[in-house]
Structures are given as C-alpha cells and as structure tokens.
Swiss-Prot record:
InterPro entries on file: 26S_Proteasome_ATPase (IPR050221), AAA+_ATPase (IPR003593), AAA_lid_3 (IPR041569), ATPase_AAA_core (IPR003959), ATPase_AAA_CS (IPR003960), NA-bd_OB-fold (IPR012340), P-loop_NTPase (IPR027417), Prot_ATP_ID_OB_2nd (IPR032501)
Binding site for ATP: G197, P198, P199, G200, T201, G202, K203, T204
Protein name in the entry: 26S proteasome regulatory subunit 8 homolog
Alphabetized PROSITE patterns for the sequence: AAA
CDD domains: RecA-like_PAN_like
Function in brief: The 26S proteasome is involved in the ATP-dependent degradation of ubiquitinated proteins. The regulatory (or ATPase) complex confers ATP dependency and substrate specificity to the 26S complex.
Lineage, uppermost ranks: Eukaryota, Discoba, Heterolobosea, Tetramitia, Eutetramitia
MF term (GO), any: ATP binding
Example of a GO cellular component annotation carried by this entry: cytoplasm
Entry's localization field: Cytoplasm; Nucleus
Keywords: ATP-binding, Cytoplasm, Nucleotide-binding, Nucleus, Proteasome
Family (UniProt): Belongs to the AAA ATPase family.
Amino acid sequence: MLNTSTSGGSGVHVVLASSSSASVNGLKNYYIAKIQEKEIVLRDKIENLRRLQAQRNELNGRVRSLKEELQQLQEPGSHVGEVVKVMGKKKVLIKISQEGKYIVDIDKSIELKDLTPGVRVALRNDSYALHKILPNKIDPLVSLMKVEKVPDATYEMVGGLDEQIKEIKEVIELPIKHPELFESLGIAQPKGVIMYGPPGTGKTLLARAVAHHTDCTFIRVSGSELVQKYIGEGSKMVRELFVMAREHAPSIIFMDEIDSIGSTRTEGGKGGGDSEVQRTMLELLNQLDGFESTQNIKIIMATNRIDILDPALLRPGRIDRKIEFPNPNELARLDILKIHSRRMNLTRGINLRKIASMLGGASGAEIKATCTEAGMFALRERRVHVTQEDLEMAVAKVMKRGDESNMSFKKLFK
C-alpha cells in the first residue's frame, strides 16, 4: 500500500510541473503577440506622423507664398519706364511714356551691367527709384513666329540654284560666322536680302537651308500676318518682332510675301485699310534703319512681285542684295529631278534627261509634284517600282500639256 501511494504522488508532481510549463509558454506567446501587435500600431502611427508632417510643410509653404503675394499686392504700384542711358554708377536716364525723361537712382539690388538701353524697368511710385528690371513685353502671336527647332533643309536639297546659294551665303551666312573678315576689310556687314521670282522656285526652301547651316534662331513671318484689323496693331507687331530678334540673336527674320505690306505707296491712300498697311511698312522701314548690321540680325524677304514693292524698301542699307530665282533651265531641272528621285524605287533604264526636257518652263515645285504623281501612278497599278511611262504620264498631268502622238498622254486622258 505504501509503495502504491508513493508512486501515485510522484505522478501528481509530474502533472503539476507540465501544466505550469505550459502556462508559462502560453503567457510568453500571448505577450509576444501583444508586442507584435503594438509594433504594427506604432509603425502605422509613425507613417501617419510623417504624412502629417509633409502636409504641414506643404501648407506652411503655401502660407508663405500667399503672404508674399499679399505683401506685393499691398505695395503701391510702380511706374514702368525704359532705360535710355546709364549716367554713372548710381544714376540712369529713364523714359516714361506720357511723362518724359528722368534721371533716377538705382537700387542696390540692381546690377549696373543689366541696365542696357531699351530695357523695361519698374520705378517706385514715391521716389522714382529704379528697383526692378522687367521682361520685355512681346505679343504672344509674335512669340509663335519663332521656330524653336532648326529647319532640317540643307543646301544639298536645293537643286539648280548654285549661284543663288553663293550669293545668299555671302550676305547672310558669312557675316554671322566670320564677322572679323568684314572688320579687317573696313566694310559694313550686309543687313538683308530679298529673293524674288515665280512661285515654286525654291525661295522658302533656301531660306530654311540658310537657317540650318548658320544655327540661328529662325523667325518666319508672312506679310499678311502683319496686316491687322485695328490701327497700330501691325506696327506694334513689327516692333515686337525685332525686339524678339535682338533677344535671341544671332537670328534670321524671314518675311515671306512681303508685297502684302511693302507695295508702293499712293498719294493720299485709298482708304483706312491701305493707310494702316502703309503705317506698318513705315514701321518696318524704321526698324530696318534702327539696328546695326553688327547685331547679328539678318533679314531675308521673299516675293513674287518685286515690281510693285516700294523703292524705299529696296534701297541699299536696308536690303543690300536682290537675288532673282528664275524657273530652272534643263540642266537645273535634271539636278532637281535627281534630288527628288534619289529615294524612289526606279526601274533600270529611266531616262531622267528626257523627263527634264519634257518639263520645259516648269518650276521646282512642279518637278517635285511630277515625282510624287509618278509614284501615285505606280501605286494605282499595285507596283512597288516607278517606270519611265509613269514619269511621262506624271509630266502630262502636272504640266497639262502633251501632243496626240504621245502614247502616255493618250493613256492618261483616254
């Protein structure tokens, strides 16, 4: 009996020990889970705090900017003037429209080297002290005229105009790239050139090629864009056009269809519209006289009717060279054909010289249209190559002429 009771007591001790160790493990796991739960909550709180701090910083920045804007709005207005001449280290001559000219003080924050003639500035309302330099005021329509991307045209894309390329290089490209040559000779740089001739002879293409090779800011404007509805708007656009050209020098101003504003003036005018056009042309003449040839601003004009232009616009000193663009001769037509057909899939035995002889009196644009039409004839017959007959039919279609014995002409118009 004693032995039995003794063994039973040891069993009870074993059960109690195992149950106590299980409870300890359970408490340990419980607190580990609680700690992990609190760590997750803590991480969420930290992320939320960081997000709130970022929002606080953003709102503080907005408050500061609004305070600065409010302070600027509460400041008294300033007079707007234009720098005429720097009179010393602390004085400058300013022109204010409707009021006249004043010699004013310069604020300490203004650099004297930035005060060049023509710069717009702000003057304090009470003391007339110069305290801010303003950007030049340019019409958005004028800003759109500037070609940001350099044109991709090159001299190799211009065919049959070797003499014209040489002349425009001397007037436009050489002064921009090598002004020291003109200084060593003691002669003034040319200001501009006018290109005239029938439509489609390559005037615009050559102007784009010049801008490509000189790496200049290319500002293209049509003369009709300067004809505005209201009085003074056209003259204002001309002034701002030259202001933008000075800011982005070296620059080339290409004025196409100049005859729309540069026609010969008549006595007394024919009406309000003609008077406004004449005022625009007078402003153009004033701007051509107002800039020096050394300012790296060159003018290229183009027209189909040089006979109706005003002599004042064409005089030397404003336009220094007149370049004629006639319709190409047979050799030039052959060069243009080779340029436009170099990427075409032509069959063997194509006689381009014969096509050039058939295009008598055609312009460069008509020759290009001939190559395009020849390709269209090939597409119409579901071919991937252009034949001699396609080119001859294209000539007949573009030039609208042919004889009854020409089989390709009969095939086109049957």
